[in-house]
Amino acid sequence: VDNAKRKGPKYSLEEGGLTVTEMKRFIVVMTVACALSGLLMLQASFGTLFQLEPICLIILGAAAIGGAIKYTLGSNPYGYRGLGDLSVFIFFGLVSVLGAYFVVAHTIPSMILLLPAVAIGCFSVGVLNVNNIRDVKSDAGIRVTTPMRIGVKGARIYHTALIAGGW
């Protein structure tokens, strides 16, 4: 839960621009829009949704949506327990790059495609890490992030490794 001490851009819910009910409705609308666009993409690519490949991708997409929701919502959000980096690396790096390749090429990605997947994953985690470094003071006692576990100096070294790993 963010508070007034948090640095960075203001959020609609935090500032009172949206009510909790409006935010929940917005989440539902965006989830449905994402699911429908994913289904349409799979239908266009595979010509059906009722084969093994599209079904596996539907399950993977549902896991990604569920992971996004559980990241900060619910009684025990994993993004506040220091697991956000791993999730971002998996979903924004490996799943997005390798999944997109599979949707287009209809073939299992070769090992060489792990290179761009890992690069995108590293850069994505780098964005998260910069935000978490910025919020170390305001997050204290509220959530646990990688910079809180390893300290700001360690997080800067980690960030350098992420960016270097992406290159």
Show the residue positions of the predicted features.
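Hydrophobic membrane-spanning alpha-helices of multi-pass integral membrane proteins
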Residues: G93, L162-W167
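Short, hydrophobic/aliphatic alpha-helical segments
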Residues: I65-T72, A117, F123, K137
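Residue-level hotspots within pore-lining transmembrane alpha-helices
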Residues: S87, F91, A119-C122, G126
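Intramembrane alpha-helical segments
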Residues: Y11-M111
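Alpha-helical transmembrane segments
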Residues: C56, I112-F123
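Solvent-exposed interhelical
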Residues: V1-V32, G121-A164
